[in-house]
Amino acid sequence: MHATRSRFPRGAVLAAVAVFSILSGAAHAADTLSVVTFGGAYETAAKKAWFEPFTAKTGVNFSLESYDGGLAKLNAMEQAKNPTWDLIDLETNDAITACDEGLLQKFDRKLLGNTSDFLPGSISDCAVSAMVWSTVYAYDTTKLTTPPTTINDFFDLKKFPGKRGMRKSPKVAMEWALIADGVAPKDVYKVLGTPAGVDRAFKKLDTIKSSIVWWDAGAQAPQLLADGAVVMTQAYNGRIDDAMHKDNKPFKIVWDAQVYDYEWWGIPAGAKHAADATKFIVAASTPQAYADLSKYIAYAPPRKDAIPLIDKKRLADLPTAPANFKRPLQINATFWADNADAINKRFQVWLTQ
C-alpha cells in the first residue's frame, strides 16, 4: 500500500511548505473555532489527536457541539444567513448534498500539497475526509454461548434470541436486510434502487422489528450492550473498540457485511472563521495526523502514507485490516443523497406500523 519514493519527494516538501505557511498565520487566528461532531469516543480521540495539538501550535481553541447528523440545522443557518459553526463533521451523503446545495464553501485541494496517496474519492470540492469508519455489529461474549459470525445471525432470532440494537435510520439497516436475505454486497444498490428491492428490505426488517431497540447517538450502542438491554447491536466500530480496550468490556465485533464510509470535514458557507477552519483541515490531513487519530480510536486513515506510521498491532483493529475486510460494502453515498428523503419517509411510517 505504501509506494516507494525518494526520501524528500517534491510533493512532500510542497505539502510541508503549505502546512507551515498556512499555520504561520496564527497571530491572526480566531480565538475559538465552533465545531460540531458526532461526539462520544470519536470526539475524544479528535481532541487528543487534532484539536489539542492545533491549539498548542496556533493558540486557537475549540468550542465543541455534538449532533446526530443530517443537514437540518445547517440549512436553517444558511436560510438565516447566520452560520454559528465554523467546521462540521459530515457523513458522505450529507457532504455531497451540502456541497451541491451551496451549504459548504469550496475547499482548495492545492493546500494539501501532494495528494496522490489519498484513497479514491476522499477529497471533494467542498470537504476532506477525516477517516474511514465502519458500521458493524457487536455482542457480549459473556451473554452468548454460541458466537454469531455473519450478518445472517443478526437476523436469526431463533438461533440467537434477544433484542437487537439498531440506529434509527434506514441507512445500513436496508443494506444489511438485503445481504441477510441473500443479495451479494456488490448487487445491494442495484436491488435497493428498485421498488421491489425496497419492499424486500423492509420485509426482512419486519422479521426482527419487534426485537429492535433503536438508538440515535453512537455512544448509546455500547451502552445498550453493557446494560444487557440487547444481546447484539449495530454500532460504529470505533465505539465498540473503545469500550473493549479502554473500558475492558467483553465485547466482540462481527465484521461480516461491515458497511464502511468516509467521515468528512467541511466548512459551512459564510463561516465566520473559515480561514482558521481551513488551517485546521490542512493540519489534520497530514499522514502523521491521520496516524495519530488511529492511536486513540480504531478508525482508518484515508491516506496510504499514514499506514506505515501506525503500530502493526493497532492496524489489526481497523476496518480496512485484511482479516476484517473479507465481505465489506462501501456505502453508496450518491444513492443515499438521491434517495434518502423518499426512503426516510417510508421508514418513519414503517416505525409506527
List each model region and its residues.
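Bacterial N-terminal signal peptides that target proteins for export
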Residues: 2-14
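Sec/Tat signal peptide C-region and signal peptidase I cleavage site
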Residues: 23-29
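Early extracytoplasmic/lumenal segment of secretory-pathway proteins
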Residues: 30-98
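Extracytoplasmic ligand-binding site segments that recognize negatively charged/polar headgroups
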Residues: 40-45, 83-85, 90-226
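A ligand-binding cleft/hinge motif common to bilobed small-molecule-binding domains
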Residues: 95-97, 232-250
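Periplasmic-binding protein-like
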Residues: 117, 133-135, 198-207, 245-271, ...
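Mature extracytoplasmic/periplasmic domains
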Residues: 263, 268-328
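Conserved C-terminal helix/tail region of periplasmic/extracytoplasmic solute-binding proteins
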Residues: 325-353
